[in-house]
Amino acid sequence: MKQSSPEGPKNYDSHSNESTADVATPKLAIEVTDLTVAYRERPVLWDVDLSVPSGLLLAIVGPNGAGKTTLIKAILGLIPPAAGQVLIYGRPYAEQRRLVGYVPQRGSVDWDFPTTVLDLVMMGRYGALGWGKRPGQREKELALSALAKVEMTAFVKRQISQLSGGQQQRVFLARALVQDAQIYFMDEPFQGVDAKTEHAIVGLLQELRSEGKTVVAVHHDLQTVPDYFDWVTLLNVRRIASGPVAEIFTDENLRLAYGGRVAFLTHKAHTRPDHSDPADPATHGKWGRIRP
């Protein structure tokens, strides 16, 4: 359905025309082929291909209305596609559901629901327990361990309605961790959190990567993409480009994704977060931010 152009953005996927016979190809965690999603006959995603190797951190980046959240929901089967195929480790998502964890946007959750932090995190184990089984001591221990990783142990008995935005996000991440998934989808995990929570989330993502897990996150802050992620997918209804940040996150590709609505920052103007590695060449260069 697509016609590749030799002058177009470089992409890394199983549909590329480039020869890879002599290159060891990493195992694909996610493979999306010709995915199209429409709302009331209006295309939100159009003919999207995406291949994600296992064991890396991938940012999905694009302007508002680009279809970023829709892409995640379509992969997870939460939105029916008009066309296309999704494979998780080479098999349909329905057969691999237990390998996947999901952290939706905080705004999509009823935080006034009367439940404690510990109970909310243990809900992440329901899929593994099976129908009709209640969580026991093992599930409680797993939940407490996950809460310790996000530094929320002191809040186990607190009602979720009493948490701050950053605390809510940490609890949501803990709920995903107890699923012990191989792939985690996160929809704007850094949105509305304080600097301490953002730092903690970055550390958690890096820990998941060190365990061989794959993380796909919708992300809006273009400045931090090179510091936080290994790969990036630029999306604007269609996939603009996808691959290693150092090769894909270029001025040209950003202009294609944002329609020229990007102000570019020079290296001197780029402020590096405290947890970044100044020796990493992937964090150097020009990066963009969206103009209001």
Language model segments and positions:
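Catalytic Walker B motif of ABC-type/P-loop ATPase nucleotide-binding domains
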Residues: Y184-E188
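H-loop/switch region of ABC-family ATPase nucleotide-binding domains
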Residues: H219-H220
